[in-house]
């Protein structure tokens, strides 16, 4: 039998779009689609038992920084605890895990970045592969999608800060790097791509305005960095050690880790806090797991408010 791809999607409309994409590409017969959530252990066990996949690409996450700052318990639940559930299920049939992470996990200033850093540790603790990327252009909800909508509506383009810079990759580049990371003989481990430079978001906005509205004078409005935002990101921290890239342009990163038993105990503390809806305890547990996480004033205020309400 030929290779098959198993797709799990939590959104019915997104799953429908995926199915139609496979039909249009004439490859629908090589795919099996599931509507469900990566936190559903019984569904995951059913999928792994039935299909026994060799490789799992885990990309499900809450990824919008402002929403994660506003909904911290939901973000921890989906980005950390659901990842733990997924990895536990995958380990029952020795599936190789490749996890898509973000440069926001490095010395995180956002709750999203901190949750992705813990998810990285979960995957690495189970012998998986982590690929830490920058911003993927034209992905769902990306800055390109937002700017394109604003241009189409004749609105000014909104950029958070004149100095805001990011690493950018195309979807094709990101997919190629995921496959390369899965096949890299140096794995399991943490990989980052060899990216040449950070780009100003304002330059991207100007390029899109020239390209999509060449006959219009499109204004750019600068607001300010949002809660959890940084002016620029980095691909590894000062406590991590990069190795020279190999032929596939991936850099292997040595990342500090703690004893597995200690890590599992800290995860259990985090899970208990989330399940009891105790934001202050969840934030404290998250900061133990990610010591270089600097919570925003918005998250700290929300935590303090929750403590007063519970008190």
Where do the model's predicted regions map?
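Residue-level signal for the nucleotide or nucleotide-sugar donor/cofactor binding architecture
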Residues: 10, 39, 70, 78, ...
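Short secondary-structure boundary/capping segments
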Residues: 22, 50, 72-74, 113-118, ...
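N-terminal Rossmann/SDR dinucleotide-binding element
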Residues: 1-52
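Conserved residues in the N-terminal Rossmann fold of short-chain dehydrogenase/reductase
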Residues: 34-35, 77, 222
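Conserved beta-strand scaffold in the Rossmann-like NAD(H)/NADP(H)-binding core
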Residues: 33, 99, 130-132
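Strand-loop microenvironment adjacent to phosphate/nucleotide-handling motifs in alpha/beta enzyme folds
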Residues: 120-311
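Conserved Rossmann-fold NAD(P)-dependent oxidoreductase catalytic core, especially the SDR/UDP-sugar
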Residues: 52, 58, 62-117, 125
